[in-house]
């Protein structure tokens, strides 16, 4: 089996993992109530999507 000839330094390890990170979800304000919601999803607070009420919220 192959074995590394030298210890991988912290810098090389971090450079290799530089692209592995969390992404921020795309949030947009709801045009009806102004609350933040995910883009292209029904607003969880008011139940509107594309100017129409889709879900009943009590």
Curated annotation (Swiss-Prot):
Q: Which Pfam families match?
A: Ribosomal_L32p
Q: Give the molecular function GO annotations.
A: structural constituent of ribosome
A single Gene Ontology CC term = large ribosomal subunit
* Keyword Ribonucleoprotein included in the entry's annotation: yes
Cysteines paired by S-S bonds: none
Q: In the UniProt record, does the keyword Kinase occur?
A: no
- Keywords associated with the record: Ribonucleoprotein, Ribosomal protein
Can you tell me which family this protein belongs to? Belongs to the bacterial ribosomal protein bL32 family.
Q: Which PANTHER family match?
A: 50S RIBOSOMAL PROTEIN L32, LARGE RIBOSOMAL SUBUNIT PROTEIN BL32
Listed name of the protein: Large ribosomal subunit protein bL32
């Amino acid at each position: 089996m192959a074995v590394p000839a030298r210890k991988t330094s912290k810098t090389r390890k971090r450079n290799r993992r530089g692209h592995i990170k969390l992404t921020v979800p795309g949030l947009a304000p709801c045009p009806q109530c102004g609350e933040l919601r995910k883009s292209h999803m029904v607003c969880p607070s008011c139940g509107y999507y594309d100017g129409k009420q889709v879900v009943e919220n009590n």
